UniProtKB/Swiss-Prot annotation:
Cofactor(s) needed by this chain: heme; Cu cation
Cofactor note: Binds 2 heme A groups non-covalently per subunit. Binds a copper B center.
Pfam families: COX1
CDD domains: Cyt_c_Oxidase_I (cd01663)
Protein source organism: Tetraodon nigroviridis
Family note: Belongs to the heme-copper respiratory oxidase family.
Record protein name field: Cytochrome c oxidase subunit 1
Alphabetized GO MF terms: cytochrome-c oxidase activity; heme binding; metal ion binding
Record key words, sorted: Calcium, Copper, Electron transport, Heme, Iron, Magnesium, Membrane, Metal-binding, Mitochondrion, Mitochondrion inner membrane, Respiratory chain, Sodium, Translocase, Transmembrane, Transmembrane helix, Transport
Reaction(s) catalysed (UniProt annotation): 4 Fe(II)-[cytochrome c] + O2 + 8 H(+)(in) = 4 Fe(III)-[cytochrome c] + 2 H2O + 4 H(+)(out)
Disulfide bridges in this chain: none
Assembly with partners or alone: Component of the cytochrome c oxidase (complex IV, CIV), a multisubunit enzyme composed of 14 subunits. The complex is composed of a catalytic core of 3 subunits MT-CO1, MT-CO2 and MT-CO3, encoded in the mitochondrial DNA, and 11 supernumerary subunits COX4I, COX5A, COX5B, COX6A, COX6B, COX6C, COX7A, COX7B, COX7C, COX8 and NDUFA4, which are encoded in the nuclear genome.
Known EC number: 7.1.1.9
């Protein structure tokens, strides 16, 4: 029974649970890798060995956190669980394809881990730039295995995207227009469109890299008329939409959490929120070369990419101020998800401001590949995406399980995590401004102080992760069942009960259009 239920599942709730468990497991692997990085950098001098093994760890940390933690949890976990409930659909549009989307991930993860275990590992960074990723600098199967891993993860995401787009457009009640669906549904829809348009470009780029390595083509080799810069354009045309894919579902979840715990029936400026997400999705495709300011582009090209990048701050600002406006005049309940949401708004804004700094091409030439960039994207990911995931998990855990988490423990956990991530990443701004480069396992001892502080912060974050596991165990051990849920009229996912039955909406939801 268990085998057929979990291996052959076509139920969106079960598949969502599989995604959440897989993502949590991968998140712990990614956390372990990050602690190896911070251990190496905690003092000058070598700890683990040479820069190759260090860069293999950095590369694996990035891939694990992006493709096996954030995306499976946000899109696969929360998306699968909540989207059908929020639009009144009995399941996803293609339930068996949904199952395949999940089961492509463990083999993909296995290939990624295998790439670290053969030869010298793939020490290329998550960008996998040639010629470093070519068959001279990386002889052996490591990079090839990484490419195959990315192929599988990419196919998984493309299939998932097709599924979500079809479900959201096609399976809501006829009386409901797209502009009456919850913001999280919009966020997943826009994310799915971004995935569908960007991943094939990555697939093309890494497939050409694969043939350059194995079939003697020269797509990225100047000796045969190729150009390594072409790879960078292909990669970043995927890579920049990807970072918006990582944060957009978080935007949707934060909108729900802020409205719920402010006691509001809807977020402030619903239409503005939707259009802002659409604008971010569109603009995300036309700014990719801001990752390449140092490759020698024309000044007019640099001017365009600087300006276009800064424009993204406008719809992002619309969202931030709409969240603050949602809080205004509400009866605010200071429960843990609200703490995560407020932390998200503040820290994501800090990360966004350093992003505005880096958008200036002249400044970026100086700051490129320093720890300033690392600090920037970890503020929007480690404190944006992760805070959104944590807030959403604490908020919707009673829906998924029927049990409540211990509110005091979750608040302590938030406090520890907040201190840990800020202590880890805030000093990295100082290191970057002082010129410490990324992707090196050692540094001059002038940089010792802030690296040590950063590494201490990472240990505090680790203790928060361990505390979270305890909180999860405590909830299932104590079995405090959900008594009642407030505001279900405007939060439709709660209306079928906690937890909802295995099959919901077996007959279509009836919606009376308001005249």
């Amino acid at each position: 029974m268990a085998i057929t239920r979990w291996f052959f599942s076509t139920n969106h709730k079960d598949i969502g649970t599989l995604y959440l468990v897989f993502g949590a497991w991968a998140g712990m692997v990614g956390t372990a890798l990050s602690l190896l990085i911070r251990a190496e950098l905690s003092q000058p001098g070598a700890l683990l060995g040479d820069d190759q093994i260090y860069n293999v760890i950095v590369t694996a940390h990035a891939f694990v956190m992006i493709f096996f933690m954030v995306m499976p949890i946000m899109i696969g976990g929360f998306g699968n669980w909540l989207v059908p409930l929020m639009i009144g659909a009995p399941d996803m549009a293609f339930p068996r394809m949904n199952n395949m989307s999940f089961w492509l991930l463990p083999p993909s993860f296995l290939l990624l881990l295998a790439s670290s275990g053969v030869e010298a590992g793939a020490g290329t960074g998550w960008t996998v730039y040639p010629p470093l990723a070519g068959n001279l600098a990386h002889a052996g199967a490591s990079v090839d295995l990484t490419i195959f891993s990315l192929h599988l993860a990419g196919v998984s995401s493309i299939l998932g995207a097709i599924n979500f787009i079809t479900t959201i457009i096609n399976m809501k009640p006829p009386a409901i227009s797209q502009y009456q669906t919850p913001l999280f549904v919009w966020a997943v829809l826009i994310t799915a469109v971004l995935l569908l348009l960007s991943l094939p470009v990555l697939a093309a780029g890494i497939t050409m890299l694969l043939t350059d390595r194995n079939l003697n083509t020269t797509f990225f080799d100047p000796a045969g008329g190729g150009d390594p810069i072409l790879y960078q354009h292909l990669f970043w045309f995927f890579g920049h939409p990807e970072v918006y894919i990582l944060i957009l579902p978080g935007f949707g979840m934060i909108s729900h959490i802020v409205a719920y715990y402010a006691g509001k029936k809807e977020p402030f400026g619903y239409m503005g929120m939707v259009w802002a997400m659409m604008a971010i999705g569109l603009l995300g495709f036309i700014v990719w070369a801001h990752h390449m300011f140092t490759v020698g582009m024309d000044v007019d090209t640099r001017a365009y990419f600087t300006s276009a990048t800064m424009i993204i701050a406008i719809p992002t600002g619309v969202k931030v101020f709409s969240w603050l406006a949602t809080l205004h005049g509400g009866s605010i309940k200071w429960e843990t998800p609200m703490l995560w949401a407020l932390g998200f708004i503040f820290l994501f804004t800090v990360g966004g401001l350093t992003g505005i700094v880096l958008a200036n091409s002249s400044l970026d030439v100086v700051l490129h590949d320093t720890y300033y960039v690392v600090a920037h994207f970890h503020y929007v990911l480690s404190m944006g995406a992760v805070f959104a995931i944590m807030g959403a998990f604490v908020h919707w855990f009673p829906l998924f399980s029927g049990y409540t988490l211990h509110s005091t423990w979750t608040k302590i956990h938030f406090g520890v995590m907040f201190v840990g991530v800020n202590l880890t990443f805030f000093p990295q701004h100082f290191l970057g401004l002082a010129g410490m480069p990324r992707r090196y396992s050692d540094y001059p001892d002038a940089y010792t102080l802030w690296n040590t502080v950063s590494s201490i912060g990472s240990l505090i974050s680790l203790s928060a992760v361990i505390m979270f596991l305890f909180i999860l165990w405590e909830a299932f051990a104590a079995k405090r069942e959900v008594e009642s849920v407030e505001l279900t009229t405007t939060n439709v996912e709660w209306r079928c009960g906690c937890p909802p039955p295995y099959h919901t909406f077996e007959e279509p939801a009836f919606v009376q259009a308001q005249t």
